[in-house]
């Protein structure tokens, strides 16, 4: 009788291999916990999608070729949300495409009661919205290199706008939306408050994020050139309240959502 080699038999080894392969397939496939929502971004909005995915547990994102491709896949049910430029969403709607709701994401803006940058001096008190090193701070620092100014501090948007109204600040910079109610109120209540354009010296400078693009904003009859990030967060409609809240929360935590909650949607 021939001696058997030590170890598992061939059949047993094959059986174990099949079991392991099945477990691996299940872990990668249908038995995995589903994402809260999937966001498909145009290439220009990819940095925003990445920031949202990092901020929202269970949120996934992928990159499409362009705005039209992202919105096409959204309407065909391949994802729950699309993150595209505002112009891309508008073009899609004008062509008869249905995307709803459409939320404004954060834009970089400068509100000043001290006139344009050339009028700023060492007495100009500047507030940057957010924290040092936060989203938008790099742009704010580039703006400040173009202006002569005095002191700089960081605060949240409400406090910054209140400082403008009280006269304890002369300029506010940061990722804010000029159409927000607080900004509209400040523009109405603060004498000589202006929504400034990006300094000409920055127009040709590569700003920190490739997704930043020149964009015209209108507010109260005023038109200002500023730089907009990302544009519009759209959904095709077949989205649960929980998914909607999750993606809005992720956008807010990533610092890119100017409309703070579902339902507060721009027309």
Task: Indicate residue ranges for each PLM-predicted region.
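Pocket-flanking alpha-helical
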Residues: 50, 65-97, 161-163, 179-186
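A bilobed periplasmic-binding-protein/Venus flytrap-type ligand-binding module shared by bacterial periplasmic
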Residues: 105-119, 129-131, 198-242
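Solvent-exposed coil/turn segments that connect beta secondary-structure elements
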Residues: 44, 86-89, 113-115, 131-132, ...
